[in-house]
């Protein structure tokens, strides 16, 4: 149904597109149109809070119209791509929503990315504009973007706040340089295809080179509205997602659903415990979440200096729900999601064992799931672990410019292979899903395959441990043995291998799964999209083993 396909993009098969259209999932509305309509419905309500300021929906709508019109003045056109290096500041929303309205495609890079990432992604996506945060602490993104232009190939650099470099456009000047009425007319004159690309998200992966995920206007809109319906987002919702707003979780899990329903989005550049907790208290946040390091630090701070968190109705995390409820005193729910599409949450009425240990059910009745026996397309038996495969109205049909990888990334009948190992359990007539681990994240100890995720879950319960990464270290007898890298809670000492084994024994974990080496770090190395790089951890322990071997034989 797409009018002008973008080369390198895999679009939904015609039959699937027609089916999702008939079901009312995929329609003819773009993200920009939907955001403008929400602004008209909620014009005088607060849309955005950040940087000591507040913006109503009317104000945010006018600003993003002007950004869109300014991009058109610079010579950009729908489907041109924009590298996005703006952190969690209000200007991120000005730029991203302005791109949506102009039909320009944000490439969801991070402010922390440097030449290796941007120097690859900008030419790969053929980006024409590079948005940067000009006042970023400790690094001059304006100078970086200007210096990289010969390699990146972008025509324009646009900066928010801070010092300007020659040839760099100031976002604020672009906004001020165009009349609001003229901007609205320019946006309305565009014919943006809702079936075409709205945003390029980035995959995680283990190769170090992110894969590019095309998400379409109508699929991203449906995804966001489905989350809003599932979670219960309304005009009274006050959302605060402290992690990167540019990530898929921030966009479709929190901020877009809230802005489409007329609620308030809070944004802070810092994510230290006091900022996190005080923002919740001051803004009466109802919907928030975080990852384990954020949660652990918040718990420590809350114990020392309690904040009023009574407004929170939903705290979303990938796991640790019982700990969050116990130590922060707020209702906690689990999420599973991926930039490639499918999203699952637990909900208030789910059975206690689901909320404590599982990730819930998919948000759309049109989501199709198959747990396949790893390496095959064959369904696993109910209750048996299998690779999580899915398709649906908002799930990827193929990575951008990656035909060879796409051959491996999908089943023969077109279901996306996530690489995640899951288990389905039927409770009360409904299937609920539990995340078991990554298929490629197993440790092969002799004849036994050990889930690194399982080891991490149990080790993570030790009181000294803030975060854990389990890997297989090379071993001449077993092939691999279990090694864990730990980040410790403040003031805690690392357990010895024997002490950790005794602790795991009290939890009933089989002895062959116990770690046989412990390493302690302050921070884990990460891939270019912020996930723990287990490849680098394996390299680290392998090098240490080699040095130890040489020391014994030298």
Task: Give the positions of each predicted feature.
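Conserved ATP/PPi-binding loop(s) of AMP-dependent carboxylate-activating enzymes
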Residues: 346, 362-366, 376-409, 448-450
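Conserved AMP-binding/adenylation subdomain of ANL enzymes
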Residues: 103, 221-238, 246-287, 301
């Amino acid at each position: 149904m797409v009018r002008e396909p973008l080369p390198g993009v895999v679009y939904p098969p015609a039959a699937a597109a027609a089916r999702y259209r008939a079901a009312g999932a995929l329609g003819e509305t773009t993200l920009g149109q939907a955001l403008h309509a929400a602004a008209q419905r909620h014009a005088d309500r607060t849309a955005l809070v950040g940087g000591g300021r507040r913006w109503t929906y009317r104000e945010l709508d006018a600003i993003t119209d002007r950004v869109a019109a300014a991009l058109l003045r610079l010579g950009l056109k729908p489907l041109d791509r924009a590298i996005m290096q703006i952190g969690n500041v209000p200007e991120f929303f000005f730029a991203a929503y302005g791109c949506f309205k102009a039909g320009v495609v944000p490439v969801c890079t991070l402010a922390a990315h440097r030449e290796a990432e941007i120097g690859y992604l900008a030419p790969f996506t053929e980006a024409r504009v590079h948005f940067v945060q000009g006042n970023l602490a400790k690094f001059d993104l304006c100078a970086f973007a200007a210096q990289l232009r010969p390699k990146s190939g972008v025509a324009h650099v646009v900066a928010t706040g801070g010092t300007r470099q020659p040839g760099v456009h100031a976002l604020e000047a672009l906004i001020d340089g165009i009349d609001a009425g003229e901007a609205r007319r320019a946006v309305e004159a565009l014919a943006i295809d809702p079936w075409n690309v709205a945003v390029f998200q980035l995959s995680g992966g283990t190769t170090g080179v992110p894969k590019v995920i095309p998400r379409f206007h109508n699929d991203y809109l449906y995804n966001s509205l489905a989350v809003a319906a599932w979670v219960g987002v309304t005009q009274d919702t006050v959302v605060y997602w402290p992690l990167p707003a540019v990530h898929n979780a921030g966009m479709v899990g929190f901020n877009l659903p809230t802005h489409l329903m007329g609620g308030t989005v809070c944004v802070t550049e810092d994510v230290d415990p006091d900022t996190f907790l005080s923002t919740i208290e001051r803004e009466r946040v109802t919907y928030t979440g975080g990852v384990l390091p954020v949660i652990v630090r918040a718990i420590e701070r809350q114990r020392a200096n309690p904040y009023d968190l009574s407004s929170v109705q939903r705290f979303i995390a990938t796991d640790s729900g019982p700990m969050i409820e116990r130590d922060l005193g707020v209702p906690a729910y689990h999420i599973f999601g991926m930039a490639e599409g499918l999203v699952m949450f637990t909900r208030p009425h789910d059975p206690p064992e689901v909320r404590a240990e599982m990730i819930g059910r998919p948000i759309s009745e049109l989501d199709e799931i198959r747990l396949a026996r790893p390496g095959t397309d064959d369904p696993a038996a109910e209750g048996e672990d299998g690779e999580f495969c899915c398709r649906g109205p908002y799930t990827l049909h193929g990575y951008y410019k990656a035909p060879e990888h796409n051959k491996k990334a999908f089943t023969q009948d077109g279901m996306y292979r996530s690489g995640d190992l899951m288990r389905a359990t039927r409770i009360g007539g409904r299937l609920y899903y539990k995340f078991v681990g990554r298929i490629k994240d197993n440790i092969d100890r002799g004849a036994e395959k050990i889930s690194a995720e399982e080891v991490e879950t149990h080790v993570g319960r030790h009181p000294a441990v803030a975060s854990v990464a389990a890997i297989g270290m090379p071993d001449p007898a077993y092939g691999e043995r279990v090694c864990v890298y730990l980040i410790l809670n403040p003031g805690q000492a690392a357990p010895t291998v024997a002490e950790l084994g005794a602790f795991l024994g009290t939890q009933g974990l089989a002895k062959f799964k116990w770690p046989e080496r412990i390493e302690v770090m302050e921070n884990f190395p990460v891939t270019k999209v912020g996930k723990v790089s287990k490849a680098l951890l394996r390299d680290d322990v392998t090098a240490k083993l080699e040095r130890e071997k040489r020391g014994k034989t030298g």
